Amino acid sequence: IQLQPGQIADFARDAEPLYRRLAKSLSRGLLVTCDYGFETAALFDPRVRFHGTLACHRRHAVHRDPFRNIGTQDLAAHVDFGLLVRVGEEEGLRTLAFTRQAPWLLACQIGEELVLADDRTRRETAMLLDGEGMGETIRVLVQAREIDDQELFAPEFRELFAASRIAAVSPT
């Protein structure tokens, strides 16, 4: 990663060894990662994220000053999904999908579950599917060992996996 002079980048030092341990420990199954993040090049693109991705959350408000409300706010930074894809594949996992949360939940047929849900659950779920909010900004990475997507998933998943493989690890 080459940073520009003055550019700030968030780096999770323990992400690689942790993900490597998780991948090695999986003898058969899926490793599903859901979080805010991007593929490596997009994550560190100085034209978009010159000041990094650190965000401070307090009472449904977001700001960038980690020293403002010490001890009373959550701090978060975006995940380098390119790193996770690379590490998982180095450890023998097969990348089935890297997509946004909304298409993932729709492929999980969340709509069918909402038919019987109460109004509050429907409203909360709508936030997860919002194309300008969480449905757009949260990514889902699915990697597998000894699992054939044909054996495990409904046709909706197979379509999603095929589309995300074509897009490699850069969902648009």
Language-model regions, residue ranges each:
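Long, Lys/Arg- and hydrophobic-enriched amphipathic alpha-helices
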Residues: 1-172
